[in-house]
């Protein structure tokens, strides 16, 4: 509703006007608590200024102006504030609705907003968070502060937490209200509009309003409820209880409550004022009581989330820590740098002086403090940290203390701004002059790849202008991986602000790795507590709390201490030099291990790589198919199989583990066995455990073969093994007989057969006889004279004639004649056996497995077999050695369960030639008899065991 209109009252009788006024007054008196009154019933009245109607009634009207004015003041009107009205507070506000401005004045109105804690259970606690995030128990604080008489006011609870308190009060009038209110009430109304609008707006900025909104949005604990109550100001002031609004709930320097006043509005009834007192912190929540109690015992909430505002001294120190070479301010024992303390698994460097220093270090520090000259006056009040007191205790710290009695400075990181370091390749013997800039002084270091002979420390110290000891420069050891860094100078370089890895003489990691073979102290990755870094831990960047002096003070100190220009005690310098020599010798001992480790590493690396090399010791084949021709192959793969990354390899280290290094028995003309690809030289082949071996040693020895012990019954199904297989030689005719690399892959490429000593000996003599016919005839006559068996042996001439008729003369064929001279891979005749046989040779009639595994069949034997009549059992004439091994070695050992005696081997020498030509003699028998069931011992696996004993005129060691 708006202000009352000022329209003039209509002319009416005086009696009717008086009756209307009395009626209106009675209505207001009978219903004083009505929430509002209709202003329209006052339209006929004005604002207490009535026009004069009758002069006779002027005296009577003058006697009642105050009552009319009070009736106007007691009107209940609104001030354009849209709020919801409710009847809940009708009874609580009855006192202020029925009050009067003169007779029944209203008491002060108190409105409190509080937290009700009645709904909390036993395991729930109401806590408040301070500005640091620490939790405080609210009820405990209220109980501790309740020292006054616990008299509860009406409608209150002792456990309630008051958030806000509003006080609306109408003061007493100074005088009676004037009779003319027409000019005063509009002004009061306008001021009241501003007041109540400000009250409505400001209430939404208070902490209690924000707390209520947050709880409604986050749906907090239902036990935490916000309520309000209306109190009479007169009864509230009589309470003898601690005010729960102003009581502090936690320790702190902040204000608990604040008060805001909306000012005083003057009115004819008295001054009208509104003020509010509220808590500044309303961050309440409900937590578990046990969790709150445990956090107190554990100290989990202590000093948590407390922002540390830097003090003035800290700001001053931070302002000085700018990039550049200007040294920082002095840091004394009383004000150590807490940021310099660090710890690791093996070491811990604390801030301040070393409390656990050894007695020796303490004595040295005391001696230095006594013998040292007085410091400049500017720094005489506080003695800076010395090397012995700031550095970690131990041998390294003791060395650093002796070498540098002056205060140390924090070393800078090893950083080379140029591509080529100008002066870091050799130790400097002459320091730059004092007029030069200190930041241009390079970090002196010594290379670790070549020895550097330094002059004695006394000579070096005598030429110094600054008077520092010789040990303050890096004394590099000869052949040392990383020289021991000396104590850093009293002023740092331009990169002192960089907190990086401590410098080790100015050598970075790349140069250190390249020079020392990755075995230096800085590049080896040794731990800080290991023995390798024991000598450099005393002068690391983070273990020294050095003084941050100005350059001017440094120059003043040089002027004061003229004795620094000449060494005072040469014996101390010599002792330091000797101690440094011991350290260099220890590092040199590790340097000597580099060559042996590098040689072993290179050898193992070369054996792991399958690369072709003309000087390597791995094996190659000359007759392999074109796809892998000349490639280095493994013992577990066939020559025609492509080499894969998973193919086993033979190490390049000469040892007995080279399982397939075969010996060459020829003496510049005789060829037996296989040769290594590295050259015509090879090693002798050890056979069994017997000491008898045919050794023809070549000029050089590269590898030793691992022998295979003889077995009575070889395993029928044996997996391929790279250590037990032999290399198969490939001849030219094999590509014609077995095209397209038709080989079996069910088993290994080939398997080593179990040969005896006599077999190796006969095999060697057989090839010698095939190469030299004269030696063959002599050997035949010697064997014929010693042989006493009934077997009739053909003459050498007949045997040679038969071989020539078949175009397979063993001694004159192009293949064998050339193989005796330049064929590097001669076939080890009889070393192959078909699947399931007794270790015999291959059989052309035994299926594709035997054909594929036939491998190296000599040409003269192949052509001789082609002339036969197609008998399946007579196709195997691999060589006489294989037939002799099957007929003698296998049958005798299988029947008698022991190998033949060496004496029997000597007696049975003639059988070598008899068995070699037995296939040819059997052909003449078969041509004459047409189907005689006798067969040679070199037949297929079906006839080797069944028809071997049916040869007329022949028996085995009868």
UniProtKB/Swiss-Prot annotation:
It comes from the Eukaryota. One of its GO terms (cellular component) is autophagosome. One of its GO terms (molecular function) is protein kinase regulator activity. Gene3D superfamilies: 6.10.140.1900, HORMA domain (3.30.900.10). Keywords: Autophagy, Cytoplasm, Protein transport, Transport. Its main location: cytoplasm. InterPro entries: ATG13, Atg13_N, HORMA_dom_sf. Residues 378-409, 469-494, 516-526, 718-729, 775-788, 840-852, 871-880 have a biased composition (Low complexity). Residues 804-824 have a biased composition (Polar residues). Residues 936-951 have a biased composition (Gly residues). It is found in: Cytoplasm; Preautophagosomal structure. The keyword Protein transport applies. Residues 1-64, 304-534, 618-730, 769-910, 922-958 are annotated as: Disordered. Residues 328-338, 665-675 have a biased composition (Basic and acidic residues). One of its GO terms (biological process) is protein localization to phagophore assembly site. Interacts with atg1 to form the atg1-atg13 kinase complex. Activates the atg1 kinase in a nutritional condition dependent manner through the TOR pathway, leading to autophagy. Also involved in cytoplasm to vacuole transport (Cvt) and more specifically in Cvt vesicle formation. Seems to play a role in the switching machinery regulating the conversion between the Cvt pathway and autophagy. Finally, atg13 is also required for glycogen storage during stationary phase. Belongs to the ATG13 family. Fungi subfamily. This is Autophagy-related protein 13. The lineage of its organism: Eukaryota, Fungi, Dikarya, Ascomycota, Pezizomycotina. The gene is atg13.
């Amino acid at each position: 509703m708006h202000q009352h209109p000022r329209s003039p009252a209509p002319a009416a009788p005086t009696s009717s006007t008086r009756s209307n006024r009395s009626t209106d007054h009675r209505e207001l008196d009978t219903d004083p608590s009505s929430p509002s009154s209709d202003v329209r019933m006052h339209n006929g009245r004005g604002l207490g200024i009535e026009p004069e109607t009758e002069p006779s009634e002027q005296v009577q009207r003058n006697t009642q102006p105050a009552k009319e004015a009070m009736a106007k003041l007691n009107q209940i009107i609104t001030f354009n504030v849209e709020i919801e009205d409710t009847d809940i507070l009708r009874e609580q506000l009855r006192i202020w609705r029925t009050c009067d401005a003169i007779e029944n004045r209203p008491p002060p109105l108190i409105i409190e907003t509080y937290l009700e804690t009645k709904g909390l259970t036993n395991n729930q606690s109401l806590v408040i968070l301070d500005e640091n995030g620490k939790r405080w128990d609210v009820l405990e604080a209220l109980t501790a502060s309740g020292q006054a008489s616990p008299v509860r006011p009406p409608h209150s609870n002792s456990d309630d937490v008051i958030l806000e308190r509003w006080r609306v009060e109408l003061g007493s009038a100074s005088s009676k209200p004037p009779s003319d209110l027409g000019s005063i009430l509009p002004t009061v109304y306008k001021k009241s509009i501003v007041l109540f609008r400000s009250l409505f707006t400001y209430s939404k900025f208070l902490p209690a309003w924000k707390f209520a909104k947050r709880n409604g949005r986050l749906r907090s604990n239902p036990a935490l409820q916000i309520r309000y109550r209306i109190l009479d100001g007169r009864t509230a002031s009589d309470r003898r209880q601690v005010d729960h609004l102003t009581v502090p709930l936690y320790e702190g320097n902040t204000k608990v409550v604040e008060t805001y006043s909306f000012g005083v509005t003057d009115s004819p009834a008295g001054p009208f004022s509104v003020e509010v007192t509220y808590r500044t912190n309303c961050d309440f929540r409900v937590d578990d009581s046990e969790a709150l109690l445990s956090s107190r015992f554990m100290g989990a909430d202590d000093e948590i989330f407390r922002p540390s505002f830097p003090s003035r001294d800290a700001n001053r120190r931070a302002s000085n820590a700018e990039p550049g070479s200007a040294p920082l301010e002095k840091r004394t024992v009383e004000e150590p740098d807490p940021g310099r303390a660090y710890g690791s698994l093996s070491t811990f460097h604390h801030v301040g002086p070393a409390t656990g220093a050894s007695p020796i270090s303490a004595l040295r520090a005391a001696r230095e403090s006594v013998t040292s000259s007085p410091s400049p006056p500017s720094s005489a009040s506080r003695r800076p940290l010395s090397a012995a007191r700031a550095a970690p205790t131990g041998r390294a710290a003791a060395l650093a203390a002796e070498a540098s009695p002056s205060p140390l400075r924090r070393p800078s990181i090893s950083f080379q701004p140029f591509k080529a370091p100008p002066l870091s390749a050799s130790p400097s013997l002459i320091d730059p002059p004092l007029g030069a800039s200190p930041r241009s002084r390079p970090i002196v270091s010594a290379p670790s790849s070549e020895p550097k002979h330094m002059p004695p420390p006394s000579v070096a110290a005598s030429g110094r202008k600054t008077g520092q000891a010789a040990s303050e420069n890096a004394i590099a050891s000869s052949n040392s991986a990383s020289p021991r860094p000396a104590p850093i100078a009293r002023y740092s370089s331009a990169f002192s602000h960089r907190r990086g890895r401590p410098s080790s003489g100015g050598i970075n990691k790349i140069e250190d790795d390249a020079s020392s073979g990755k075995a230096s102290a800085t590049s080896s990755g040794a731990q800080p507590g290991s023995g390798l870094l024991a000598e450099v831990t005393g002068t690391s960047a983070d273990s020294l709390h050095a003084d941050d002096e100005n350059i001017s003070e440094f120059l003043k100190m040089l002027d004061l201490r003229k004795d620094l220009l000449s060494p005072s005690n040469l014996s101390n310098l010599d002792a330091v030099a000797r101690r440094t020599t011991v350290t260099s010798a220890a590092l040199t001992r590790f340097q000597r291990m580099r060559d042996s480790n590098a040689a072993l590493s290179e050898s193992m690396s070369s054996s792991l790589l399958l690369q072709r090399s003309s000087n390597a010791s791995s094996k190659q084949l000359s007759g392999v198919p074109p796809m892998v021709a000349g490639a280095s192959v493994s013992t577990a793969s066939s020559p025609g199989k492509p080499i894969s990354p998973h193919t086993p390899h033979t190490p390049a280290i000469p040892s007995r583990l080279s399982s397939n290094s075969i010996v060459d028995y020829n003496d510049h003309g005789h060829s037996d066995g296989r040769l290594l690809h590295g050259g015509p030289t090879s090693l002798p082949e050890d056979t069994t455990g017997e000491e008898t071996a045919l050794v023809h040693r070549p000029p050089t020895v590269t590898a030793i073969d691992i022998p295979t012990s003889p077995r009575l019954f070889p395993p029928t199904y044996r997996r391929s093994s790279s250590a037990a297989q032999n290399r198969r030689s490939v001849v030219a005719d094999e590509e014609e007989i077995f095209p397209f690399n038709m080989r079996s892959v069910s088993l290994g490429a080939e398997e080593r057969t179990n040969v005896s000593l006599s077999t190796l000996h006969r095999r060697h003599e057989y090839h010698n006889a095939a190469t030299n016919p004269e030696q063959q005839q002599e050997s035949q006559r010697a064997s014929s004279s010693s042989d006493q068996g009934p077997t009739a042996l053909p003459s050498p001439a007949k045997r040679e004639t038969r071989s020539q008729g078949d175009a397979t003369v063993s001694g004159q064929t192009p293949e064998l004649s050339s193989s005796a001279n330049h064929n590097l891979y001669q076939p080890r005749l009889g070393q192959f056996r078909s699947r399931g046989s007794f270790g015999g040779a291959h059989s052309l009639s035994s299926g594709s497995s035997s054909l594929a595994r036939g491998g190296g069949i000599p040409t003269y034997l192949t052509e001789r077999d082609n002339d036969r009549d197609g008998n399946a059992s007579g196709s195997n004439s691999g060589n006489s050695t294989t037939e002799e091994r099957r007929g003698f070695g296998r049958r005798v050992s299988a029947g008698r369960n022991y190998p033949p005696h060496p004496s029997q081997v000597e007696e049975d020498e003639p059988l070598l030639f008899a068995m070699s030509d037995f296939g040819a003699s059997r052909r003449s028998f078969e041509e004459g008899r047409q189907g005689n069931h006798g067969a040679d011992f070199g037949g297929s696996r079906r006839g080797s065991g069944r028809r071997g004993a049916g040869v007329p005129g022949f028996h085995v060691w009868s």
